[in-house]
UniProtKB/Swiss-Prot annotation:
Classification via Pfam families: SOR_SNZ
Pathway: Cofactor biosynthesis; pyridoxal 5'-phosphate biosynthesis
Record-linked InterPro entries: Aldolase_TIM, PdxS/SNZ, PdxS/SNZ_N, RibuloseP-bd_barrel
Family assignment from sequence similarity: Belongs to the PdxS/SNZ family.
Alphabetized UniProt keyword annotations: Lyase, Pyridoxal phosphate, Schiff base
Residues annotated to bind D-glyceraldehyde 3-phosphate: R166
Protein name per the record: Pyridoxal 5'-phosphate synthase subunit PdxS
Disulfides per UniProt: none
GO MF: pyridoxal 5'-phosphate synthase (glutamine hydrolysing) activity
Annotated function: Catalyzes the formation of pyridoxal 5'-phosphate from ribose 5-phosphate (RBP), glyceraldehyde 3-phosphate (G3P) and ammonia. The ammonia is provided by the PdxT subunit. Can also use ribulose 5-phosphate and dihydroxyacetone phosphate as substrates, resulting from enzyme-catalyzed isomerization of RBP and G3P, respectively.
NCBIfam families: PRK04180.1 (NF003215), pyridoxal 5'-phosphate synthase lyase subunit PdxS (TIGR00343)
Biological process according to GO: amino acid metabolic process; pyridoxal phosphate biosynthetic process; pyridoxine biosynthetic process
Length: 295
């Protein structure tokens, strides 16, 4: 019997439907409803948000399926869930449950420190993180339908997401400006599939959407990432670690949509209460940097 898989075109098309929107981390049905009411285009069902994963330490695994099911039953928007890098069984379980997307995520403790999942073998579309064009194209080559910056999850610090978005977009501009005979060397230097490097030169952009993630903590952070070329925004710990999650979630959505309306963003940012405290990058030990968990 032939194995059933989704085509790249279908998977990428599904991801394109989320373009311009906000995807929010939630840990229960109540939070999922708040996210949906605020205008989120999708939710990420988790057992713990990244800041709590970071604080707790230990091994972080796929969420309890009960939590994922509760979220799926509570909302009408797409539901995503995270699987550990390289953990075939976690991903297959989530696919069997009927989640709309799987995030092969460095936020969870990697199950395989050498190989990512061959995402083209699955029917469900995958989301993956990247810091540069090499990581981006390797994940697309494996079958990812959506990318996101890795940033530094659970810190409330936008600096790494900014770095990663600028890096990817700068390298895209380099590729677009290359002659055809330079592309093979570029593919080798980036550690990226040659055919995908050629596709970027032809399209002038990535063949999949690239969202901002990892450190988005305020409406201004979300708007900044859209200004820098993000196709949308993931918000992890920022919303439900704030003083007023419903108001904060709505402000993030509006700031993402109207990211050049600075007067509106200023109004949205008033009286939101305190955002999550955040962590300065220099205070993180190297072993605590989630973004370094995969290449």
């Amino acid at each position: 019997m032939e194995k059933k898989v989704g085509t790249d075109r279908v998977k990428r098309g599904m991801a394109q439907m989320q373009k311009g929107g906000v995807i929010m981390d939630v840990v229960n049905a109540e939070q999922a409803k708040i996210a949906e009411d605020a205008g989120a285009v999708a939710v990420m069902a988790l057992e713990r948000v990244p800041s709590d994963i970071r604080a707790a330490g230990g091994v972080a695994r796929m969420a309890d399926p009960r939590i994922v099911e509760e979220v799926m039953n509570a909302v009408s928007i797409p539901v995503m869930a995270k699987a550990r890098i390289g953990h075939i069984t976690e991903a297959r379980v989530l696919e069997a449950m009927g989640v709309d997307y799987i995030d092969e995520s460095e936020v969870l403790t990697p199950a395989d420190d050498e190989f990512h999942l061959l995402k083209s073998d699955f029917t469900v579309p995958f989301v993956c993180g990247c810091r540069d064009i090499g990581e981006a194209l390797r994940r697309i080559g494996e079958g990812a339908a959506m990318l996101r910056t890795k940033g530094e999850p659970g810190t409330g610090n936008i600096v790494e997401a900014v770095r990663h978005m600028r890096q990817v977009n700068g390298q895209i501009r380099q590729i677009v400006g290359m002659t055809d005979d330079e592309l093979m060397v570029a593919a080798k230097n980036f550690g990226a599939p040659y055919e995908l490097v050629k596709e970027i030169k032809s399209l002038g952009k990535l063949p999949v959407v690239n969202f901002a993630a990892g450190g988005v903590a305020t409406p201004s952070d979300a708007a900044l990432m859209m200004e820098l070329g993000a196709d949308g925004v993931f918000v992890g710990s920022g919303i439900f670690k704030s003083d007023n999650p419903a108001k904060f979630a709505s402000a993030i959505v509006q700031a993402t949509t109207y990211y050049t309306d600075y007067e509106l963003i200023g109004k949205l940012s008033k009286e939101l209460g305190s955002p999550m405290k955040g962590i300065e990058m220099s205070r993180l030990n190297p072993e605590d940097r989630m973004q370094d968990r995969s290449v």
